[in-house]
Design a protein with these regions (language model features):
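Interhelical loop segments of eukaryotic multi-pass membrane proteins
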Residues: 23-30
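C-terminal luminal/periplasmic domains and tails of membrane-associated envelope-modifying transferases
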Residues: 30-175
């Protein structure tokens, strides 16, 4: 019993101060339906999934305002200001304050087809099956801020490689 209490406390403290995105590690053990763009369970043991779980797996079960309220916009701004070489950042967030008013030098985020540049995409927009930003799932984020804001740097070479391999299509392209 003491072990379970300590585990629960450590689990909650590990994600602090990003508590809205908290998921218990057991979320990694709950099966999810496979999708061509979101891999289902990793082919690893339950113990390995359990030890590497938490908010990373929560997106498979809940999204939208369950996790992403734009709470990481200020942390994204802090991260952006520490970077060099990023002229403009495309931001797609659920925050109530428009990113331009927070001080981001903005660029538009291409809705349907990837374009080179730096982008920060809130997890809600990544999870939507009907959204035009799902193509970002085919790329590896540079960093994840607060478990809800995924930062990508797309290069033309990466985009061309994904398109030529057939792993990425814009919404206007037919499968």
């Amino acid at each position: 019993m003491i072990f379970l209490v300590l585990w629960s406390a450590a689990s909650a403290l590990r994600i602090y101060p990003h508590s809205i995105a908290y998921f218990n590690e057991l979320a990694a053990l709950i099966p999810t339906p496979a999708s061509p763009e979101i891999p289902a369970q990793e082919k690893s043991s339950a113990l390995v999934r359990l030890l590497n779980a938490g908010p990373r797996h929560g997106l498979r079960h809940l999204s939208d305002s369950n996790i992403d309220w734009g709470q990481e916009d200020l942390n994204l701004l802090r991260w952006y200001r520490r970077q060099s070489g990023i002229d403009k950042l495309g931001v797609c967030s659920n925050g109530s304050i428009p990113p331009g008013q927070l001080g981001f030098p903005l660029k538009s985020v291409p809705f349907d087809t990837p374009a080179p540049g730096w982008y920060a995409i809130g997890c809600d927009f990544l999870c939507r099956e009907d959204g035009g930003f799902r193509y970002f799932r085919q790329f590896t984020p540079v960093t994840v801020i607060g478990q809800t804001m995924y930062v990508y740097h797309l290069t033309q070479e990466e985009i061309d490689a994904r398109k030529s391999s057939g792993t990425i299509r814009g919404l206007s392209e037919k499968p």
